[in-house]
Amino acid sequence: MKFINRYSAIALAVGLLTLNMNAQAETVSLNTNTASQTSAEIQVLQQGQWDNFNKQHLDAMITKAKQSPAHSYYAVFDFDNTTAFLDIEEAVMIYQLEHLLFAMTPQELKSVIFKDIPAADFSADFNNKDGKPVNIDKVGADILESYQWLYDNYDGLKGDKPLSEIKKSPHYQNFITKMRYLYAAIGGTFDHAVSYPWVTYLFMNMTPEQVAGITAKTIEWQKSEPVEGVVWESPASLPGQAGVVETDWHNGFRLVPEMQDLYQVLQKSGIDVYVISASNLEVIKSIVTQAPYSVPESQVFAMHLLRTKDNKLTSDLDPVYPQTQGKGKTETIRKFIQNKYAGKGPLLVAGDSEGDQNMMSDFPDTEVVLIINRLRSPDTIIGQLSKQAVKEHGQKDAKVLLQGRNDSTGVFVPSQLHTPLGAKEGRALK
């Protein structure tokens, strides 16, 4: 397989970022290399790498809420790129692909990868290496041809060859590259209502426990991976109908200690914590219901697949639950959460993307909106909220907080600035 590192990785603060899934109950410890605060100042959260104003504002919010009876208020968090650095669903997909962790026959895989995908050509950004357009019919045929070979030969499916031998075949390279390419092409071409659920269907025929196991192994693997851009290219020896294609992603998923601390402090202060994620429910539950997050399972909402009678996941979303992205996050709060708190909206909403902007702006009584800065477009609601945060920074009555991050290291930075992967300088707004 052709692997290309597009950017140099800056491997800083690894000890700060890593979390051993086998020792999650340990107390989170953050670096506090900041000037000492006077006794008159509120100290609730550990300093870590928070922007100082953001920390002080969150401290004040928590201290005020503690004056009310426990469970009077609640906070809602996104997971991917908010609670964590990068996207756990995407990281799990890479691990699943590289280890061929599938429980589907070729015919079942066909039903999954074609599910709800329009026949139109993908965006020109996803043309093949010859500049020609690609669509689901073309790349789907190539994926299924290679998966059939893998299914017949790999001893983890129906064959008798070990993975080490399977990896030498161009079918392995072709399958994993074109699957990851398809995921990117769907997301970059079609509506989020199509693209977000699609990747969750790859768990078809697995139990929740199997998904949780894959997730734990993914986190363990990723915590020692460099933070960098990676590119895969499909083998020229198997162009198929789609031709040779390329796909890239941001490697180095990390759990963020500042957010772990925030979860803990909120709950210890009597503020209930909810997680609403566009990733698969079993993936998210396996992380946030454990220490140090310790969120009750009933307070976790994500893409909720129906199960069979023997508790295996299907490729159908449970219609009882809204799609947990965009307006669906607001719908989830209104349908399952708000009435438990006398109709109040969340005290705090934390997110990073357009998928979070509705729940950030739909509840007038929300006191604080925390945005993890990823330089969102000014044409979006979250882009406008980010602009508001820059304007309000330092003001006592600020509602929106913008927290900076360096995407070359995976850590928060003590400012509002976002530094993209490979960039040398950060900025507050796009």
Language-model segments: residues:
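C-terminal cap/substrate-recognition subdomain and adjoining C-terminal extension
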Residues: 26-57, 63, 67-74, 188-193, ...
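Glycine-rich nucleotide phosphate-binding loop and flanking beta-alpha elements
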Residues: 83, 91, 377-378
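N-terminal low-complexity, Ser/Thr- and acidic-residue-enriched intrinsically disordered segments
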Residues: 78-87, 158-162
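Short gly/ser-rich anion-binding loops that grip negatively charged ligand groups
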Residues: 201
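Non-catalytic pre-domain segments flanking phosphatase-related domains
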Residues: 3, 7, 14-16, 23-79, ...
